[in-house]
């Protein structure tokens, strides 16, 4: 895989709360230079990013119910509609992890579907299951519920919890959702070796703040 192909699999990410206007402008400039799949930013920065990326192939991705997933489904649905109205092309939502652990699967599916329905095919929906907090059984169940609810992708992590993507989790997620659904690895992908390992195991998208280092074959210690 060459640098250009790899770049098209990466969501160039900055989700730090202290990200200012200059940070977003730099992120978008880099995304245009490398032709990354998208920039992934907090909702407050969607309008600016949409303006900076207008007319390019680079998509605007934002986060919903982030990073805890503990908002109500009504709030997540509103966030989704608002983000799309402001220019988002993709939304990465966090599941209700506590309800999953309660085995309240009906709620978890409805919560995901609320975002899928709010997106109304105007934006891709990615479902963050926060793998580091789940058992193997819970990871499988979360992926099954995301697929059943009609989401486009399952995603490993927020990057704000106790761990990120692992090749093993990506393999399990890919085996669970089958060949057609997207699988996004995020959190802890900081080198070309990390990227190749998750791609080999079934990732079709990578969320990273170390995107440039990955494409240039370097190692970064950067975090979201």
UniProtKB/Swiss-Prot annotation:
Catalysed reaction equations from the record: 2-deoxy-D-ribose 5-phosphate = D-glyceraldehyde 3-phosphate + acetaldehyde
UniProt entry tagged with the keyword Ribosomal protein: no
Active site: 92, 155, 184
Localization: Cytoplasm
InterPro entries assigned to the protein according to its UniProt record, in alphabetical order: Aldolase_TIM, DeoC, DeoC/FbaB/LacD_aldolase, DeoC_typeI
UniProt EC number: 4.1.2.4
Name assigned to this protein: Deoxyribose-phosphate aldolase
Family: Belongs to the DeoC/FbaB aldolase family. DeoC type 1 subfamily.
Gene Ontology cellular component annotations, sorted alphabetically: cytoplasm
Involved pathway(s): Carbohydrate degradation; 2-deoxy-D-ribose 1-phosphate degradation; D-glyceraldehyde 3-phosphate and acetaldehyde from 2-deoxy-alpha-D-ribose 1-phosphate: step 2/2
């Amino acid at each position: 895989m060459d640098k250009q192909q790899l770049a098209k699999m990466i969501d160039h990410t900055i989700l730090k709360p202290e990200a200012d206007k200059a940070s977003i402008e730099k992120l978008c400039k880099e995304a245009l230079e490398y032709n990354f799949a998208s920039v992934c930013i907090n909702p407050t920065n969607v309008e600016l990013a949409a303006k900076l990326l207008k007319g390019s192939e680079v998509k605007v991705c934002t986060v919903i119910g982030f990073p805890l997933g503990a908002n109500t489904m009504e709030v997540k649905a509103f966030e989704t509609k608002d983000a799309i109205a402001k220019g988002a092309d993709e939304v990465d939502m966090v599941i209700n992890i506590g309800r999953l652990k309660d085995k309240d699967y009906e709620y978890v599916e409805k919560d995901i579907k609320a975002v899928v329905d709010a997106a109304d095919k105007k934006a891709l929906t990615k479902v963050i299951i926060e793998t580091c907090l789940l058992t193997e059984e819970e990871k499988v169940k979360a992926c099954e519920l995301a697929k059943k609810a009609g989401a486009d992708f399952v995603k490993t992590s927020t990057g704000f919890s106790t761990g990120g993507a692992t090749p093993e989790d990506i393999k399990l997620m890919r085996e669970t959702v089958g060949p057609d659904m997207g699988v996004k690895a995020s959190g802890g992908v900081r080198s070309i070796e990390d990227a190749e390992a998750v791609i080999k195991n079934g990732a079709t998208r990578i969320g990273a703040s170390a995107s440039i280092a990955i494409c240039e074959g370097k190692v970064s210690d950067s975090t979201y």
